[in-house]
Structures are given as C-alpha cells and as structure tokens.
Amino acid sequence: MPVHAFVDESARPPQYLIAAAIVEPSRVRLLRQSMRALLMPGQRELHFKKEKPLRRRALADAIARLPVEVCVYTRSCRQLGEPARQACFAELVGDLLARQAHRLVIDSRNEQDIYDERTLRRLLGSQPSASQLVYEHVDSTSESLLWIADVAAWCFGAGREWRKRIDPVMSTVIDLG
C-alpha cells in the first residue's frame, strides 16, 4: 500500500536518530487537522523541545492515540552528526522504497538539505521516477505532520517515561550501531 512519510531528527550525543511518521494517504487530511488542533493560540508549529514538561506529556499522549505508525533509525555519533544522519536516512529510504512509498517529506535544515539530496540520488539511481517516490524538504511551520516525527524523535531519545508514552505508535526501531 502506498504511504507517505514525514521525517525529523533528534541528536542526543552519543546518539543520533531519525523518526519517520508513516501515514496512509487517506488519513493525511484528518491527521493534519488533529495536529493543528494541538497548537496553542498564536503558536505556528509544535517544536517539542520548546514545550514545558506538562504540555509535553499531553502532546505525547495525544500523538500516541493517532492512527499513525512511527519508525525510528538510530546510530551512535561522537562529534559530527552528518555521517550518522545519512546512515539513518539511507536505511529509512531503503525501507520506504521496499514499501513502495509515494511521498517523503523531510524537515528542512536549509543548506544541509544537500546531503539528504545526495543520499536520495544515490539510492534512487539513474531512474528516480521508477520508484514513484517524490521527496521534498519543507519548513515544519508549513507541514504539521512533521510535528509527529519531532515529538516521536524527542520522546524516543529521552527514553524511559517518554518512550513509553509514544509506544502505541512505534512500529520499528532500527539501531545501526
């Protein structure tokens, strides 16, 4: 079944991780509405690390009830996170291609987006249209489904209580060492 993936990252040295919120196309509209309903008055986006602990709990619990699947890819990193990110990203893209995903939306890191694009070109080969995977980098203020990945990445990286809160939506954890 074709799916869409919405991807964000979290770095908690010595661990780097990428979370992908996997969404069925028929649920995109409903999930966007659900995510926007979580905004506070005047808020343009959810950025989990900026939220207060009580609100974090409420947000994590709300996301755990959504009809979404989250996949997490982790790798240890000592200093530079980019090699770890690209290893996680490549594994994610490979899994998305195997699932015949149609859309990949990545939280933009502006100038650093070029590294993701290189990895995508390498994996998609000389005929990217054969995969039917369309990808784009967007700012998280313009795509509310990226917030699911942001919350999941933060909670997974924080461990213990936080990881338990999002466990209902967690489907896959790939540790790349």
Language-model features, listed with the residues they occupy:
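Phosphate-ester processing/binding pockets and catalytic centers
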Residues: M1-G177
